[in-house]
Amino acid sequence: YDPLKDIEFLEFELDMWYFGILKKGWEKFTRIVKQENQDIKKALAKQLSGLNVNEEIVQNAIKILKLDHHPMQWNEDELKKLARELRIATKPMLIAANKIDVPGAKLNFDRALEKFKDYIIIPCSAESELALKEAMKHNMIKYIPGENNFEITGKLNDKQKDALEFIKKNVLQEYNNTGIQQVLDKAVFELLDYIALFPGGVNKLEDSEGRVLPDCFLMRNGSTALDFAYRLHTDFGKNFIKAIDVRTKLIVGKDYKLKNKDIIELAVRK
């Protein structure tokens, strides 16, 4: 069994999915484009908008593949290559190389790094992360997900000690973490380009139960204070007056672009 084949299979299936959408009604589509003298970039972007394809993505793909001739003359092989380029641009992938503590896994991980250089590939052990969280849940250890160590705080039997020692030696010390939190962080903040935002007050960061900043909202990088207001509640957006950066205590306007981990207080008309 070669896990790299799984990656190739997934790529192929996605490429064929895109190709199937492109191929369906292609002759009719290109005939209309020619008859109405449409811009192929705009026409394709509109046709594939459900896949998050835009004009810029189409233009780049056409440029890479040097599809200078009319779309009516594009052959099946060229359409497959176009489908692949569009898939790469609209479906970024991260590979979670799970079971990294299994014998032989390190070799496969190194092979994957060499073969799939355009992907983020993270070594991880979901089983180790689960074991650590279960031990934490039962007050046996102190552990923060994503960190490279844990502290034993409870009574353990020999089997539990051996299991934790195995995780420490073969996962945490070898790869610096279990990889699970890193997979989530990379996927959300790098691939999807989200930022984390917290609603809070200049003079109050706790809720009625004493929890500090209990709520976190994920939004696209580039989101504004007004976007955040609408995300919290439509009425907040409609009645927006100003926002306050809680850390700096500076007043910011509706067009202020928010940064990752900003704490924002909103002022709205009642």
Description of each model-found segment:
Residues 268-270:
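Short, charged beta-turn/beta-strand-edge "cap" motif at the junction between a beta-strand
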Residues 218, 257-258:
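Residue-level "contact hotspot" at macromolecular interaction interfaces
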Residues 203-208, 232-245:
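Short, basic/aromatic beta-hairpin or loop at an interaction surface
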Residues 1-4, 15, 99-103, 126-131, ...:
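Conserved nucleotide-binding/hydrolysis micro-motifs of P-loop NTPases
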Residues 261-262:
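Loop/turn positions that initiate beta-strands
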Residues 208-223:
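Short, contiguous acidic and Ser/Thr-rich linear segments
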